[in-house]
Regions:
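PRPP-associated nucleotide enzymes
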Residues: 1-236
Length: 236
């Protein structure tokens, strides 16, 4: 970075001889979006095309404008999508792993971008999960991707649900099933883990109420905010 905090971008000199380059952008914060924009702008100025590997789609959970009791929350994914569309003449393709929402992909395509989606079943390490008895989706939003893995493993699927507690307004995770899960091996599947609240709550329910034997988890994208790497072992 420069002394004022601006991002410094350096591209190799021999890039001028390229007709098309591959870009892998693992974006973890807003500065990554800005850095990608700078690179795309330079490539466009030089007339160089690119294939963009974007494993995690930034702002994908902020895909709707919202009005709360205290503020407005903008559709920040729309802003990011429009940034990418500014460079659609040089972006030959965008490859994304297990996107959070199909609507996000539809928007990118509507803006003239070609998107290659890698499904969760294409990255799932099948050999690592051969002794699973049940697969659980932590909510309705994860049902489709969880169903894909359940089909791969040929095991039953259970879908939990989230409800807002009217007393404290907090989101609570509920698992209602009459299945006997005692001493069973459970696999939880989701696309994103951030603070880990859903995983923590589901694990607690499975251990305390259903006496399961073992809980495994497969997540496509690990955000792991708030130092979650250190807190997950003690919480589960």
């Amino acid at each position: 970075k420069y002394s004022d905090g601006s991002i410094e971008v350096k591209l190799p000199l021999d890039i001028k001889h390229k007709e098309c380059v591959n870009i892998r952008a693992v974006i973890t914060d807003v500065s990554g979006i800005l850095l990608l924009t700078y690179v795309l702008e330079q490539l466009q100025c030089m007339g160089i095309k690119c294939k963009l590997d974007l494993p995690y789609l930034p702002n994908s959970r902020q895909e709707r404008s919202q009005k709360t009791d205290s503020c407005y929350k903008p559709n920040s994914f729309l802003s990011f999508a429009r940034i990418l569309s500014n460079y659609k003449t040089i972006i030959e393709s965008i490859t994304i792993i297990d996107p959070h929402s199909e609507d996000n992909i539809s928007l990118l395509e509507l803006l003239g971008l070609y998107v290659n989606v890698i499904s969760i079943k294409d990255i799932f390490p099948l050999d690592n999960f051969q002794n699973i008895d049940y697969i659980i989706s932590p909510d309705e939003g994860a049902r489709k991707r969880t169903s894909l893995i359940a089909t791969l493993l040929n095991v039953p699927m259970i879908v939990a649900r989230k409800e807002r507690n009217p007393d404290n307004r907090e989101i609570e995770l509920i698992l209602n099933t009459e299945l006997d899960l005692k001493d069973k091996n459970i696999l939880v599947v989701d696309d994103i883990i951030d603070y880990g609240n859903s995983l923590h709550d589901l694990t607690k329910i499975l251990k305390e109420n259903y006496k399961v034997k073992r809980i495994s988890c497969f997540i496509s994208h690990a955000i792991l905010s708030s130092n979650l790497r250190l807190t997950i072992p003690s919480r589960t």
